[in-house]
Amino acid sequence: MIEKMIREARSQRASDIHISEGQAVYLRIDGKLIKSDLELSDEMTRKLILSLLTKERQESIWRGEDADFALETSDGNRQRVNVFCQQGRLAAAIRLLNAKVPTLSQLHLPPVLQNLANEPRGLILVTGPTGSGKSTTLAAMVDYINHTRADHILTIEDPIEYVYEQDQAVIHQREVGKDVCSFAGALRSALREDPDVILVGEMRDYETISAAVTAAETGHLVLSTLHTTGAANTVDRIIDVCPVQAQNQIRIQLAGVLKGVVTQCLVPLIDGGRIAATEVLTGTDAVLSQIREGKTHQLGSVMQSGAAAGMHTLDYDLAKLVSRGLIEKKTALKYAQDKRELEQCIF
């Protein structure tokens, strides 16, 4: 039943499936929730969701915890599944992933991301709201490294979303809750495992942030995600998560290791589907100086004048998509950070 449901959702270009006892099945298509034609009784829904869970995961659900895991179907595709309870009833959110990691060009991402992936060391962050494609962008960067240089790549994920086929690189993928207890613990262990590149699925807390920055300081290329919008907000968020007594130190450390921040959101195309609109901040001397001095409010101006270093604001990228006839102006205005800047950028 679940495989049939997933196949049908994929045929409709859905990105997510929502299943809940007592409710209809919903699909997210091009960012919008659409009611599915599939009808399930409460009993069928409950059995379907329970069939996805191991005994241990069922026990965690009854303890009031969520279950977050990957599901591979017979066609080789993977799905990220989150099962939870609401009002005493079971529910599941299923994110549909591709079996094959897309390339940076297939994702229509700017060439500067390839330049960032070529960095031998430092910290690269991909940020944006939930469902904005952060994990897919990181996977494309990791796979680019896999096909271009003989590095040892270590990923720490919760759960593992894409499984890489080794090419030039040696790749080890560790899953939180299965192979390791936590992101921070896995990062500390990683420094003894001779990696060149470390992918951290998400920097959720101070301990993980501190360990990731330390790994970048010690000569590794660290890639991770944050649920933030805008490059300046990302830097501020990292610092704000830290204890007050550690904030100045983390600011100095960031200024020493940050190579780039990529913020993205998925916007609807005129002809259907969605495309990533991006904001890119690269670790130039001017950027790192502003971070070191606590002047993150000036990073927007640096990005506006930093095209030669691959930088651009989200509003500039949205304006470019409008000018190319890919998205409507009203769509761009909906996602814009500064509507006046967007109007000025449309050409």
Model feature map: region roles:
Residues M1-F347:
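Short, flexible helix-loop junctions that flank or precede catalytic/ligand sites
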